[in-house]
Amino acid sequence: MPVSYMEIDLRAFRHNLRVIRSHLKNVPALAVIKANAYGHGAVECLRAALEEGCVGAAVARVEEGCVVRASGFDCPVYVLGLPLPEEMSVGVNEELILPVDDTTNLEAL
């Protein structure tokens, strides 16, 4: 049975970011690194993205935001998916930017 393998060329990734940033001018950009940067390595991709001018990160879940923080990043980290009420305090403690969709999550803050 074949094994899938993927490797990202960070030089090409950085080049692509520079091209995108050149079109955005002064518009802040986030690095969307959910699902381990779609399998490319969230930590490595975020480091490169921040060095190329991105201002923060977006992740799918609180757990992914915790990985960003545990890796030493202090940039803004937006959680795109709705956290469970019991995850709200973790997100707050990790200084993640959390979505709130109802009073249950609001009260959990």
Name each region found by the language model:
Residues 4-7, 12-14, 25-109:
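Active-site-proximal beta-alpha core segment in soluble small-molecule metabolic enzymes
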